[in-house]
Amino acid sequence: MAHPHLLAERISRLSSALEKGLYERSHAIRLCLLAALSGESVFLLGPPGIAKSLIARRLKFAFQRARAFEYLMTRFSTPEEVFGPLSIQALKDEGRYERLTTGYLPEAEIVFLDEIWKAGPAILNTLLTAINERHFRNGAFEEKIPMRLLVAASNELPEADSSLEALYDRMLIRLWLDKVQDKANFRSMLISQQDESDNPVPASLQVSDEEYQQWQKDIGAISLPDPVFELIFTLRQQLDNLPNAPYVSDRRWKKAIRLLQASAFFSGRDAVAPIDLILLKDCLWYDAQSLNLMQQQLEILMTGHAWQQQAMLTRLGGIVQRRLQLQQQQSDKTAFTVIKEGGMFSRRPHYTLPPEASASTLTLLLQKPLKLHDMEVIHITFDRSALELWLTKGGEIRGKLNGIGFAQTLNMEVDNAQHLVVRDISLQGTRLALPGAAEDSMPAEIKQQLETLENDWRQQHTRFSEQQHCLFIHSEWLGRIEASLQDVGEQIRQAQQC
């Protein structure tokens, strides 16, 4: 077996070769390649003339000796046109019912069936057996068929509650394609002279029969770690609780997990990673509504839970809350406290300064800086006699902001705990404290918790960085996940700096 990273590089180069000359079809080619390498089926939905058949033809070149079968279904299609005509000689000479399958679906590795929903019941029933069991009943004998990839296409979805649903459920990967959108790509497509029948894949990249068979065994050996299973189960529960969510059978879940194993294997990993779960968005939808729903649910899972983003933010919220509690406790201890005076029947309570405030001028620190009179203020200097007068009779109180300039009018009050509180123009307030009493440093408990959280964030970011090299995942998803992790990291850093 090739080294995992060499295999991943080879599959990447193989995909690039298959994508050559096809515009805005990279994701479709890659997922069809993944389906072919893992023996799954694909449904392509989209209008006529958008290279659906060309995608299927290209996949033939991924293998060294692959045969292809292509057919356009109509309401009048017969099993003979898909599975081969009856052998007149066998029927006449030996009385045997036998089909001549050479050149037809039973002997093809790559199969493309266009307008699939127009197939009649006789074709559908035989096709179901071929997809499920990779067997074809030819007369009295069961023949194993070599089909590695079935690509079915249509410009419409099957009708609900129809006989077509059983076949639709067998199409594991479902892709919704559209016309070429980008102007430059559209121009390149128009002037391209590439022959669509040419083989764009070097022989050194093509997959041999022996490699293909060995890889099927290797895919099954890829592990599903418990944390990844928990994410899958969470998604399943979310879908079960949504009223408009599509029904996903146990069979489809099982086949989808094998696809995730294949994604991990061909990305050079020995275990399914959270990044592989993004593929589920192309496996679990049924119609346009459920397609959008799956996109939303996967985005919630990937940007909120797959790398512990929401859990880390919850922990951060708890740490910040604990820090506020400690700060409040410290604030109560260090705040400048005045002495309440006055009789029971006084209209207005009045206060006196504590004994330790004996100097003729008092400098009091703001426990939290405020912007007062267009200045960032960290301490205020008061004339002791003016402060005593204000505490006794009320009225206007002035103080020098940061101890400089003229004394400025202040919005100050005594709170219920007999602490002096100064407020800014938006009425945000902070208590005043004597110099030497304020505690500005972060509590050791909080500092340790934030450092631990930051280390956990770094581990999650490293995990994502190591796993993001996945050929089958669109780069837009990687950008969203990276942004979600960076947002968590920024909030942690801001908390450390406060």
Curated annotation (Swiss-Prot):
Disulphide bonds in the chain: none
Subcellular location as annotated: Cytoplasm
Reactions the enzyme catalyzes: ATP + H2O = ADP + phosphate + H(+)
InterPro entries according to UniProt: AAA+_ATPase, ATPase_RavA, ATPase_RavA_C, MoxR, P-loop_NTPase, RavA-like_AAA_lid, RavA_ATPases, RavA_LARA_dom
Molecular function per GO: ATP binding; ATP hydrolysis activity
Summary of subunit composition and partner proteins: Homohexamer. Interacts with ViaA.
Gene this chain is encoded by: ravA
Protein name according to UniProt: Regulatory ATPase RavA
Function: Component of the RavA-ViaA chaperone complex, which may act on the membrane to optimize the function of some of the respiratory chains. RavA functions as an ATPase.
PANTHER family assigned: ATPASE RAVA (PTHR32204:SF0)
Organism field: Salmonella paratyphi B (strain ATCC BAA-1250 / SPB7)
Pfam families per UniProt: AAA_lid_8 (PF17868), ATPase_RavA_C (PF12592), bpMoxR (PF20030), LARA_dom (PF20265)
A single cellular component GO annotation: cytoplasm
Family per similarity comment: Belongs to the RavA family.
Activity regulation description: ATPase activity is stimulated by ViaA.
UniProt cross-references to NCBIfam families, sorted A to Z: PRK13531.1
